[in-house]
Structure formats: C-alpha cells, structure tokens
C-alpha cells in the first residue's frame, strides 16, 4: 500500500520552516469563550483534536498554498535564477582584477571649468526598444496666408450658397392657411421685425410699380414752390390793403415737413427746381418793412441748417442776401440773429476756403505796448494822492452833490468778444525748452495714436 502525499513524513527543511512559521504566529488563548456558548465549544473540540493529530507538513503546505505573497517571491527567485543560468561561468575563471589595464590619472576637483570635459554618451537601443512604436514627429507648421485663406473662404462661401439654394428649391412652402390664427399672427410679427432690423437700402432714384419716384418728387417740389410763391404774393397784397397776412402761416407746416424729408435732399437743393427761392420769399421783409412772423423765421432757419447748400444753390436762389440782412439788422430776435450768423459762417466757409477745424484756424495778430497807458495811470495816481486831506475833502464834496446825470455809477462798456489776438512776447531761455501748452499737445497726440491703433485692430 503506497503512502499518499498527505501521509508522507516531512523533510528537515520543512520542519525548520514550520517552526519558524509557528513562532511568528500569535498564541491563541486556550478555552477562549465562544459566542455560541459551551455547546459550540464542545462540538469543536473533536475537530481540534483531529487537526492536532495531522502531520506538520500538511499544515505547512496549507499555509504556503494560502499565502499568495510567498508564491510571488518564489516566482521572482525562479526568474532571477533562470536569467543567471544562461551566463557561462567558465569564461570568468581566468579573470584577475589586479591585471586590469586602468590608467593612473590624478584626481581632479570638479568645478565649472572641467565640468564640460565629462563626455555625453547616448544609450544604445536594443532590439526590443526598436520594436516599440516611435512617436510621430510633428511636422513644420505652415504660415498663415491671407490670400489663400480668402480664396478658401470664397470657395466655402460658394459651396454654402449653392447648398442653401438647393435647400430652398427642395423645400416646399408651408401653407399658412392650415395654421391657427395665433401662429399666423406670430409669424407675421416675426417677418415684420426681421424687415425692420434689416439694413436700410437706398430708396432714391428707383421705380416702384412702374412709377418713377424721382420724377414724382420733382413734381411735388415744383408744385410746392408755386404755392409758396403765390402765398407770398397774397400776403404782400393783403398787407398793402391793410388786411392780415395769413397765407404763409397756413402753409408753414407743409413747407417744414417737405424740407425735413431726407429722401428729397438732393431735389430740395437742386438749382434747377430752385425751391429755396420760395423760402427766400417767406423770409424776406414785406413791402412796408415789417418782418415775417417769428414762427416762420425760426422753423425755416432750423430746416435750412440741415440742408447741404452749396455755392450754385446760393447763387440761383439768392437766399444768402436775406441771411446777411438778418445778421446786420437790429429788429430780429437775438436767437434768430445767432441762427443767421451760424448759417452765414457755414455757407461762406467753403467759399473762402476756411477750415472748420479750430486747431488749424488762423487768427489776426497785433502788437500791443502797455507802457504809455501805464504811465498815464501812474501819473493820475500821483496827482490824486498829493495830499490826503484834499482827497478826503473832494470825496466829501462829491457825496454832498445833488444826484445828476454826471455823478451816477454806470457799468463800463467792454468787448465781449475779441477778433485780434495779441502777439506773444515770451522769450525762451533755451532753444531746447518746451513751449507753453506742449504737454496738452502730447496728450492729444497719444490719444490720437490710441484711436488709430484701435481702428486698425477692429479692421483685423
């Protein structure tokens, strides 16, 4: 009868390892209380006796089988032994470490100078490393070409437009009659909002339903010119007969609404139609020298300030003469007079070739020597302060005089505006000194440079 592996006697090495393993394990207390009570303890007693009767080799084998760490250590040792087993130990029998040819060189202290003498050696790759997938090297990046990008953008735009046209042809229009009233109203509102938000197009010089709008505008302006001329003649006749002149006042709202229409701007200032001549008839004084109503002056001058009137229009209409009359006459209101001066300056500036930029404006200069006036002033002061008693007596006698036209206090007449600029007499000590106001010019120059840079950035 052959012995089974479980009943074979343990070897001495197994016994030693078993003793070491048992020494490491913690000692379990005998007669430990169990949760099940005495009955469970009595039932487990025979099993413990049977386990103690088993050989030590069986317990050692079970512990080694249950411990995975021991298996891993054993696997590592076996791998190392397999690698070393391939080396031929016979070739190292004649090796003598004392006969190795090593050059005797003096030891050097490593510093910044001789640190660069250490060579660099690249590690040689093995066949296994060569079999690994090499990292794909990034190629050279192409520079951006604006012209090529524009061409590609145009091609893409053409493709998109073709695709969009194809979709439009394929799509079938939805019948709105099948929709409920709320949906139809919502879609109508959306269409109206889209049309309102679209960029406005030029509506001048086009035809709508076979009607030439330009010709229609010219006819309307010509009719208004004739009516305005007739109204001015009727007011002049009524004024001669002593009746109130009301025809121009009745037509004033229609005239102002026509002058404020932006789509008729070119026709309004056209010298051939010459509507501004009728406006001149409304603004000029009547035969008896009386001025037109204040409402006519204010509304028409406000409308004239918005029109681009040029030299040809001024010559054909003659309205500039009426504006000059309002600037020189004393009868118009101050507000009307200022509006007339503003119109005259705006119309004469391109004729006189003057710029509206105040930084480029040229002022008339004149020299002024205050020394003679100062000498007269000091002489008066000396004559007045000859004696304190005389001055006090003079002041007392002046106060006791009866009130007359000569001894009343009046505000002195001074110039409110100046047209001649005094010539500067400041002498610079050094030619490298900065002139007065240079800091303001530098600040303006920097602000202008920032605006130009911002505009260039927005274009990109």
Curated annotation (Swiss-Prot):
GO BP field: poly(A)+ mRNA export from nucleus
Family matches, as PROSITE patterns: TFIIS_N
Region annotation Disordered: where it falls in the sequence: 1-186
Keywords, in A-Z order: Nucleus, Transcription, Transcription regulation
Start-end of Basic residues biased regions: 133-147
Primary localization: nucleus
Bias kind Acidic residues: ranges: 64-101
InterPro entries the record matches: RNAPII_TF_IWS1, TFIIS/LEDGF_dom_sf, TFIIS_N
Record keyword Transcription present: yes
Residues of the TFIIS N-terminal domain: 277-354
UniProt key word Cytoplasm: no
Compartments (UniProt record): Nucleus
GO CC, any one term: nucleus
Bias type Polar residues, positions: 1-16
UniProt feature, compositional bias: Low complexity: 48-60
Biological function: Transcription factor involved in RNA polymerase II transcription regulation. May function in both SPT15/TBP post-recruitment and recruitment steps of transcription.
Similarity field: Belongs to the IWS1 family.
Name of the molecule in the record: Transcription factor iws1
Gene: iws1
């Amino acid at each position: 009868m052959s012995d089974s592996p479980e009943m074979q006697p343990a070897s001495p090495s197994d016994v030693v390892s078993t003793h070491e393993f048992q020494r490491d394990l913690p000692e379990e207390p005998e007669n430990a209380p169990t949760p099940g009570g005495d009955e469970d303890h009595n039932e487990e007693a025979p099993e413990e006796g049977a386990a103690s009767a088993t050989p030590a080799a069986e317990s050692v084998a079970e512990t080694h089988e249950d411990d995975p760490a021991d298996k891993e250590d054993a696997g590592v040792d076996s791998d190392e032994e397999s690698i070393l087993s391939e080396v031929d130990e016979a070739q190292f029998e004649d090796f003598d470490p004392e006969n190795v040819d090593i050059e005797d060189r003096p030891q050097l202290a490593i510093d910044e100078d001789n640190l660069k003498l250490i060579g660099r050696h690249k590690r040689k790759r093995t066949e296994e490393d060569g079999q690994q997938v090499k990292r794909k090297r990034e190629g050279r990046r192409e520079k951006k070409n604006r012209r090529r990008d524009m061409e590609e953008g145009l091609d893409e735009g053409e493709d998109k437009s073709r695709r969009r046209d194809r979709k439009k042809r394929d799509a079938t229009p939805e019948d709105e009659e099948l929709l409920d009233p709320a949906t139809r109203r919502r879609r109508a509102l959306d269409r109206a909002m889209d049309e309102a938000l679209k960029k406005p197009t030029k509506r001048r010089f086009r035809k709508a339903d076979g009607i030439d709008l330009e010709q229609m505008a010219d006819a309307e302006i010509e009719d208004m010119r004739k009516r305005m001329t007739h109204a001015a003649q009727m007011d002049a006749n009524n004024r001669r007969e002593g009746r109130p002149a009301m025809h121009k006042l009745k037509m004033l709202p229609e005239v102002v609404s026509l002058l404020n229409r932006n789509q008729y701007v070119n026709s309004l200032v056209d010298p051939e139609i010459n509507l501004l001549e009728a406006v001149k008839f409304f603004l000029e004084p009547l035969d008896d020298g009386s001025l037109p109503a204040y409402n006519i002056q204010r509304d028409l001058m406000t409308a004239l300030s918005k029109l681009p009137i040029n030299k040809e229009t001024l010559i054909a209409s003659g309205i500039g003469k009426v504006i000059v009359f309002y600037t020189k006459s004393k009868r118009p209101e101050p507000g009307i007079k200022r509006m007339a001066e503003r119109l005259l300056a705006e119309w004469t500036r391109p004729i006189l070739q003057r710029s509206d930029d105040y930084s480029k404006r040229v002022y008339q200069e004149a020299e002024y020597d205050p020394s003679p006036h100062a000498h007269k002033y000091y002489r008066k002061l000396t004559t007045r302060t000859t004696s304190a008693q005389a001055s006090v007596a003079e002041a007392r006698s002046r106060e006791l005089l009866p009130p007359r036209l000569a001894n009343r206090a009046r505000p002195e007449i001074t110039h409110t505006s100046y047209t001649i600029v005094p010539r500067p007499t400041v002498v610079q000590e050094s030619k490298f000194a900065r002139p007065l106001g240079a800091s303001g010019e530098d600040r303006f120059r920097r602000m202008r440079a920032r605006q130009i840079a911002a505009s260039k950035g927005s274009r990109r």
